[in-house]
Amino acid sequence: LDPQTLRVLLRIAGALLAVLGHVYPVFAGFRGGKGVATGAGAIILIAPGAALFSALGFVLVLGLTGIVSAGSITAALILPVAVALGAAGRPVSAWLLGFAIFLALFVVYTHRANLGRIARGEEKAFEKLRFLRGRRK
């Protein structure tokens, strides 16, 4: 492996282990978070340009709906597209694209209960976060 590929692989491996450790922590009975914040932090370090596009998607959906999980899922789904289009700021790495796809699918998987609540109209919306459209009275 060339040094650049090795650097990317090591970053991805660290990010993958951090996300999995957050979602399935050994000392908390393998019940943790949903991996969004940890994954976002990792992507900021690995592919800051792609992270920016994902963050914009998060803010847009959060501002429209007030639903954090919808923003998180949107950001995750934007990530592989942003990486594929070169927003990572470097030539598209198959390893990075693969990790972005995995992370997107994993975030959707960890939010499956939230998706059910969204579909039923039961997911909690934070009205104060709905800054892009009028507040409900």
Question: Model-found features: residue ranges?
Answer:
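Interhelical loop and helix-boundary elements at the membrane-water interface
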Residues: 1, 23-37, 63-74, 110-137
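Hydrophobic/aromatic positions within or immediately flanking transmembrane alpha-helices
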Residues: 11-15, 69-72
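Loop-to-transmembrane alpha-helix initiation sites
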Residues: 52-54, 68-76, 91-103
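Interfacial segments of multi-pass membrane proteins
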Residues: 17, 35-65, 77-88
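Alpha-helical transmembrane segments of multi-pass membrane proteins
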Residues: 18-22, 58-62, 83, 100-110
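Helix-coil boundary and interhelical linker segments in multi-pass alpha-helical membrane proteins
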Residues: 1-13, 44-51, 85-98
